[in-house]
């Protein structure tokens, strides 16, 4: 059955202008800014989302899409990339004490305290269940810092061929230049579903969370875990600029369907459920309109010489810091280098001052 591309006018508010590639990732039809749906079956239900993808996780077939590669602010759905990137790098049993910076992150927070210690496993739960921006920063700091984590996340996006995705924060908080697409969110979520630890975090409904004294209960923000039969879960997000976003998957009859949406103005849960229902109803009957591509081999995904390459390798008990550490207190090579420059610069300045007898007011030298 042929595929019909229905071209529609789409608002770019909150999106990032981009040049459509000659061959869009996943297939030519996915370059359309409008609805792309198979003929011979009923069209997908209407949704207020500016962009969406419905895909078969098992085969990678894209069953329908709208503006699949439109680049928009991802909000907290970007935490899927954070988790997928950092789960293999950090020992889940490692204990950390979060920095004040991590604890004071704006937006949604799980309530980290500088007086408490947490396992990395706790932080991933807080990230994917409670959408904790504080947990996102604590994980980034544990991974070697914000800059290192951004390099790692963007390298992972390239490996997945999620070329519409540019990560600027580990939490998804809005930042200029940050973007993703419904297609990329589907790629990231599909890769995450193949990771048992990722799948455990996104499917957990409730869990206990440590406090300075005792613990408290946290619950998953994905409402469909309670409302939709077979829901596996993944992640929702919202900011005033990004509006509503979601990527999630459900399994019925041994088959898994995934839906991702971006820029939804209102309450999207029922619409997502309808899109999932449609996906299950046409799976195996409709001609796919595109394909979720496989990740690149490691050699192809590696940055070119001179590019910023991720330096962090998978943390193992043999090389990781002591079991209890403070993420904010990191003695890195860069900090030692800066210290050496400051000391050397100070000595040189003193010699010049003595040699020429120039009086200079103290405190004028800068790093």
What are these regions (language model features)?
Residues 163, 170, 174-184, 189-367:
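Domain-terminus/edge residues, biased toward the C-terminal soluble/receptor-binding domains
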């Amino acid at each position: 059955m042929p595929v019909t591309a229905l071209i529609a006018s789409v608002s770019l508010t909150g999106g990032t202008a981009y040049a459509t590639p000659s061959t869009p990732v996943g297939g030519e039809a996915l370059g359309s800014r409008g609805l792309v749906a198979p003929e011979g079956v009923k069209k997908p239900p209407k949704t207020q989302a500016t962009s969406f993808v419905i895909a078969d996780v098992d085969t990678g077939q894209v069953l329908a899409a709208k503006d699949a590669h439109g680049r928009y602010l991802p909000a907290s759905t970007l935490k899927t990339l954070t988790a997928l990137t950092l789960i293999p790098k950090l020992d889940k049993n490692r204990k950390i004490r979060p920095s004040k910076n991590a604890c004071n992150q704006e937006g949604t927070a799980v309530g980290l305290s500088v007086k408490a210690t947490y396992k990395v496993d706790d932080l991933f739960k807080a990230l994917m269940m409670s959408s904790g921006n504080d947990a996102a920063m604590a994980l980034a700091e544990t991974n070697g810092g914000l800059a290192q984590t951004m390099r790692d996340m963007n390298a992972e996006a390239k490996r997945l061929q999620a070329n519409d995705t540019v990560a600027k924060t580990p939490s998804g908080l809005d930042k200029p230049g940050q973007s993703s697409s419904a297609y990329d969110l589907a790629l990231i979520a599909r890769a995450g579903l193949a990771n048992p630890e990722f799948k455990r975090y996104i499917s957990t409904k409730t869990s206990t969370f440590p406090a300075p004294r005792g613990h408290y209960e946290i619950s998953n923000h994905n409402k469909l875990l309670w409302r939709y039969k077979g829901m596996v879960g993944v992640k929702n997000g919202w900011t005033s600029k990004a509006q509503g976003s979601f990527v999630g998957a459900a399994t019925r009859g041994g088959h898994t369907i995934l839906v991702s949406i971006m820029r939804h103005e209102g309450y999207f849960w029922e619409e997502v459920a309808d899109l999932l229902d449609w996906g299950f109803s046409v799976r195996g009957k409709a001609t796919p309109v595109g394909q979720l591509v496989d990740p690149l081999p490691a050699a192809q995904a590696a940055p070119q010489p001179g590019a910023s390459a991720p330096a962090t390798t998978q943390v193992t008990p043999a090389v990781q810091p002591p079991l209890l550490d403070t993420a904010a207190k990191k003695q890195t090579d860069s900090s030692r280098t800066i210290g050496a420059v400051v000391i050397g610069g100070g000595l040189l300045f003193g010699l010049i001052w003595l040699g020429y007898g120039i009086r200079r007011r103290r405190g004028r030298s800068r790093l």
